[in-house]
Swiss-Prot record:
Species, as recorded: Pasteurella multocida (strain Pm70)
Subunit structure: A double ring-shaped homohexamer of HslV is capped on each side by a ring-shaped HslU homohexamer. The assembly of the HslU/HslV complex is dependent on binding of ATP.
Protein name (Swiss-Prot/TrEMBL): ATP-dependent protease ATPase subunit HslU
Keyword match Isomerase: no
Binding positions (ATP): I18, G60, V61, G62, K63, T64, E65, D256, E321, R393
This protein's encoding gene: hslU
Gene3D superfamilies recorded: 1.10.8.60, DNA helicase RuvA subunit, C-terminal domain, P-loop containing nucleotide triphosphate hydrolases
UniProt-listed InterPro entries: AAA+_ATPase (IPR003593), ATP-dep_Clp_protease_ClpX (IPR050052), ATPase_AAA_core (IPR003959), Clp_ATPase_C (IPR019489), HslU (IPR004491), P-loop_NTPase (IPR027417)
SMART domains for this protein: AAA, ClpB_D2-small
Taxonomy of the source species: Bacteria, Pseudomonadati, Pseudomonadota, Gammaproteobacteria, Pasteurellales
Source organism, top-level taxon: Bacteria
GO CC terms: HslUV protease complex
Length: 443
């Protein structure tokens, strides 16, 4: 669980997302409140429920990116889902309970990785011993018992030192590794997901404990054996309980495109399913118990963050009960030409840095002038105004158009320096930006 302060969280998000200060603050406070709640004593801790968030803003302004970056910062079970993928009970499609099942699976991976890291030192020693046994099979007496001598120990220590220094990395050895579990995909009708999970677990258990001899380089064998040995040191039941606790206390669910399941007054028929999805979401958001293959999971303290463009529907089109369970509303503003300019240069791994690095692999040095950045930003902004406003995603289209000629010829331009200035941008984009018909089809 992250112990970062709200200011630190916002500062970290600022490195990747331009603007949208209100949304960053709301998310940062919500994440910090998870930590604050865990510091409380039990009777009060149970009463403090998370304040769920509804992010409202046009497409391409950073809603989903905030969720992606939050997942990395949270160090907690996190899942992002599309509201449109779900249907109400009785319709063909995924049920909303699968959100919690997927979140629990995510928590299992997170907790397993944490436990493996805790046991890594012991696992490394055991893995080294197995590799040394393969390199130097221990001598046995006439009764088949392993004999240890000073010379054997000395040789073993010499090889252990070489192994740790990487001198044996490219040598190949035969080792016994755990056989991969049987991957059985079972299609099930709605409402039968739990039964299919149990069947899949049964098939996986059939192959568990089996080993397979493989020929591998020592470098790769060491990684495989460390994971294998670490898995032996982990108690599966403890792992399940820790994963369930992590989901119940620190889990975060990000529901994107929630505006697409709003009921619109002028439609009927299929919209019944849309409202049904909202009603199915209610128990999850309010607090219920969901059965998963790892155990029963309570959703009372899971944080839900919903987002939507709400260009056709409005937040008030959500059913009142769901509106009441998303008390914090945050509006994200549309991006300006100045924002586009900052997006091109300020974030870590900005678009311009990405293209420079890609072309550098071919030995081509790309230079962007300040004026060219400004013109690219203006071009993207103008196309958004003339056609559909898709926010910062327009920059990807514009940059691909701008870099098209260089990307195609880069392999023949090794050692050259290409300076992208205002004239270059106008030459590449000018006609397309000015002609609205071309903009619609090309940009």
């Amino acid at each position: 669980m992250s112990e970062m302060t709200p200011r630190e969280i916002v500062s970290e998000l600022d490195q990747h997302i331009i603007g949208q200060a209100d949304a960053k603050r709301a998310v940062a406070i919500a994440l910090r409140n998870r930590w604050r709640r865990m510091q409380l004593q039990e009777p009060l801790r149970h009463e403090v429920t998370p304040k769920n968030i509804l992010m409202i803003g046009p497409t391409g302004v950073g809603k989903t990116e905030i969720a992606r970056r939050l997942a990395k910062l949270a160090n907690a079970p996190f899942i992002k889902v599309e509201a449109t993928k779900f249907t109400e009970v009785g319709y063909v499609g995924k049920e909303v309970d699968s959100i919690i099942r997927d979140l629990t699976d995510s928590a299992m991976k997170l907790v397993r990785q944490t436990e493996i890291e805790k046991n890594r030192f012991r696992a490394e020693e055991a893995a080294e011993d197995r590799i040394l046994d393969a390199l130097l099979p221990p001598a046995k007496n006439q009764w088949g018992q392993v004999e240890t001598t000073d010379s054997n120990n000395t040789t073993r220590q010499v090889f252990r030192k070489k192994l740790r220094e990487g001198q044996l990395d490219d040598k190949e050895i035969d080792i016994d590794v755990a056989a991969p579990s049987m991957g059985v995909e079972i299609m099930a009708p709605p409402g039968m997901e739990e039964m299919t999970n149990q069947l899949q677990s049964m098939f996986q258990n059939l192959s568990s404990g089996q080993t397979k001899k493989r020929k591998m380089k020592i470098k790769d064998a060491l990684k495989t054996l460390i994971d294998d040995e670490a898995a032996k040191l982990i108690n599966p039941e403890d792992l399940k309980q820790k994963a369930i606790d992590a989901v119940e206390q620190n889990g975060i669910v990000f529901i994107d495109e929630i505006d697409k399941i709003c009921k619109k007054g002028e439609y009927s028929g299929a919209d019944v399913s849309r409202e049904g999805v909202q009603r199915d979401l209610l128990p999850l958001v309010e607090g219920t118990t969901v059965s998963t293959k790892h155990g029963m999971v309570k959703t009372d303290h899971i944080l839900f963050i919903a987002s939507g463009a709400f260009q056709v529907a409005r937040p008030s089109d959500l059913i009142p009960e769901l509106q009441g369970r998303l008390p914090i509303r945050v509006e994200l503003s549309a991006l300006s030409a100045v924002d586009f300019e900052r997006i091109l240069t300020e974030p870590n791994a900005s678009l311009t840095e990405q293209y420079k690095a890609l072309m550098a692999t071919e030995g081509v040095n790309i230079e962007f002038t300040g004026e060219s950045i400004k013109k690219i930003a203006e071009a993207a902004f103008r196309v958004n105004e003339k056609t559909e406003n898709i926010g910062a995603r327009r920059l990807h289209t514009v940059m691909e158009r701008l870099m098209d000629k260089i990307s195609f010829n880069a392999s023949d331009m090794q050692g050259q320096v290409v300076r992208i200035d205002e004239a270059y941008v106008m030459d590449a984009l000018g006609d397309v930006v000015e002609n609205e018909d071309l903009s619609r089809f090309i940009l």
